[in-house]
Regions:
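ATP-binding N-terminal substructure of ATP-dependent carboxylate-amine bond-forming enzymes
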Residues: 1-87, 91-93, 97, 104, ...
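Glycine-rich phosphate/pyrophosphate-binding beta-alpha loops
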Residues: 62, 143, 194, 262-276
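Short beta-strands and strand-loop turn motifs
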Residues: 80-85, 111, 137, 258
């Protein structure tokens, strides 16, 4: 009955979770009504309620719902739930581990390295990487804390800002690839941001991006290759139900790369996975 204490430091993905439905209770009012004024997003009696249900629908984003803790708790208690199991969530939440698994499984992915709190002052010229670069928290969701760095000043500023994000003790650094983005669910959805990166704002603001399914700018053969790579990625990360792999096709050479895996992709009417499912014939 103290499950809520395990999840007392939610990250930025929480804002998206609150936006899943307009019919959810007022969480601010709910917290104020608690005798202990607990700020937890998971309150008392959650376990009892979930045990009463035939199945629990997972609609949590960011580490609070995708790092595998909640799934492991439910597994131990015999509670059925939607989405991947605890192992799949744990593996995919860590972007560096995901890269390593992709490489051993034949899934094309950008090379990358990481810095921890102890090594965050490492100079750019010591990394063996060249600008432009992408800097992002090793374990976070919704593209929160993702920075594209074109100058050394950008790089050091991004490192500083990334480590300022709650619960961030490691950041991933990888080459920036300019290209077209595709979400693989398995049918592909092409993502065309209105302005620059498909970041937090463009993902969740109306009109932030155009989403085309099936893609019209990609030939059938390349679509098939990306879908097969997506299947290998799902299998390698133990994504045994539904999930979404994000790919980019390089403008420079036409090669495609898997950027990361989303264990619990958005499931609103405007989200990418439901659009892909509809294109595949699922309503």
């Amino acid at each position: 009955d103290k499950l809520e204490e395990i999840f007392d430091r939610p990250d930025g993905g929480l804002e998206i979770s609150k936006g899943i439905s307009t019919s959810v209770p007022d969480l601010g009012a709910l917290r104020k009504s608690r005798p202990d004024q607990s700020p937890s997003e998971i309150g008392p009696n959650v376990i009892e309620l979930c045990q009463m249900a035939d199945i629990t629908f997972m609609a949590l984003h960011g580490s609070i719902g995708e790092n595998g803790k909640l799934q492991a708790t439910f597994d131990n208690l015999g509670i059925k739930y939607t989405g991947p199991n605890s192992l799949g969530c744990t593996l995919s939440m860590n972007k560096l581990v995901t890269k390593q698994i992709f490489k051993t499984s034949g899934v094309p992915t950008p090379r990358g390295t990481s810095l921890t709190v102890k090594t965050k002052d490492t100079r750019l010229d010591e990394l063996g990487y060249y600008l432009p670069l992408v800097v992002k928290p090793c374990s976070n969701g919704s593209s929160i804390g993702v920075y594209i760095c074109h100058t050394e000043e950008d790089y050091y500023d991004a490192i500083h800002k990334s480590f300022d994000i709650d619960n961030t003790d490691e950041v991933v650094i990888e080459p920036f690839i300019k290209g077209r983005e595709f979400a693989c669910g398995i049918p592909l959805v092409e993502i065309v941001p209105k302005d620059g990166l498909f970041d937090y704002a463009n993902k969740y603001q109306a009109g932030g991006a155009s989403e085309i399914c099936p893609p019209v700018s990609l030939d059938a053969e390349t679509q098939e290759l990306i879908q097969r790579a997506g299947e290998r990625a799902f299998e390698a990360l133990r994504m045994d139900v539904y999930s979404r792999a994000d790919f980019i096709v390089s403008d420079a050479d036409g090669e495609f790369y898997c950027l990361e895996m989303n264990a619990l992709p958005g499931m609103t009417a405007a989200s990418l996975l439901p659009k892909a499912a509809k294109a595949a014939g699922y309503e």
